[in-house]
Amino acid sequence: MKLPEAIIIDGKECLDILCCKILIWEANSDVIEINDPDENKCLVIRECESIEINDTYKKLINSASVRFPRGTVIKRTITSENIEKEGATTVYTERLIDGTVVEKRKGYSTAQPTDFKVGQRIRIYLGYYKDRGKVFKNATERLQAMEKEAFVKNVPDFDGYIVKCSVSTPIEIKCENLASGLKRKNVVKLGPMAVTVNNLLKEGGKYDLLRGTGLKLHPKTAERDINIGKIQLTEDLTVADVLTEWNKYGLYSFIRKDTDGTPYVMVGHTY
């Protein structure tokens, strides 16, 4: 395996280290959470075998897959008080069924398929940390420095839901973005009649198809009030079905986050 080449910064050799932070928690059925959950109230994973993210404005529902090797460590609920009280006794080893000896910490455990459920929220952060050879006091200080640099914008590279999880090793979870919920919202019977995007999707609009999904129509799309033409809808169709069908006519729907992280459905033509 070829090692990464060092780069020179301020006369010192540095290595770019790719960092990841994956947050997994129970979804709120009423709203789509914008802020990250407290790390003491979710699963936190900082190591994986591979991450693949497929993201394009030409698809409403984008996807991601994450693979975890045997022995991947998950951080579970743990408080600073626990750490202070337990001290050095927080580190111990555990022998797995296959004979592997794993070092573990109180509040941490190795990943198991049962840790992941369909419908859970997942947020993936990726970024680079430049290793300048600095010596840190402890692992916590090093982790904080790495994440401060790697995730400086604090913008996730993927935000969505778990839709499938393998039961074998390595563990692999399949995910879909925040538009995934639109596959569970059926439309109303309509037409044939002429409609606009605002009629169908705008909050307070005539049909308001996004109501109850946690998503709203992007203000910039609402300003344009795009004319769809004459359409007919049946109750067996979902909102995702309708928005995806528009792709055939060069009208694309995709998720776009505002500066504060609020997710919107944006609709527009390609030119």
Briefly describe each language-model feature range.
Residues 7, 13, 76-77, 90-95, ...:
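Short linear proline/tyrosine/threonine-rich motifs used for host-factor recruitment
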Residues 67-69, 73-85, 95, 100-216:
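Surface-exposed cap/loop segments at beta↔alpha junctions
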Residues 7, 20-24, 51, 64-66, ...:
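Hydrophobic beta-strand residues in large extracellular and virion-surface proteins
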Residues 40-83, 87-88, 92-93:
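Short beta-strand/loop turn elements enriched in aromatics
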Residues 1-49:
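Polar/acidic, low-complexity leader/linker segments enriched in S/T/G and N/D
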Residues 61-63, 119, 228:
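Surface-exposed or flexible loop/turn and strand-edge residues in extracellular/cell-surface modules
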Residues 9, 26, 36, 85, ...:
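Acidic surface patches and DE-rich sequence motifs
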Residues 2-5, 13, 134-153, 157, ...:
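Short beta-strand-centered interaction patches in the first periplasmic/extracellular domains
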